[in-house]
Amino acid sequence: MFVMTGYAQCTLENHEKFEKGNRHNIGLFTLDNDHQKNIDQIKKFIKSLGWDSIEFYFTEEIHDKTTIKHETVRQGMKRAYKNGQSLIVDDTPIYLH
């Protein structure tokens, strides 16, 4: 399991949690060992969920899922094990200067 962290801009209209145009931290969980080669496919997946201007700044391999204690992260990993990949988004917008 790999987690790619970065940020993306919301493109969703009238979403209850996210305002269009705001940027948020994201975590993309994937089982794809070639995730760096398949970055276009990964970004297409994220765009299909209503996010754009996607930038990744860190990738980490998770060797032992039992060490993950944060429930949102655990749920994201669970969905990735089921579906091959999963996206989590931080509710709080970020502002880049």
Regions found by a protein language model. Name each.
Residues 1-31, 36, 40-56, 60, ...:
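Long, contiguous binding/interaction regions
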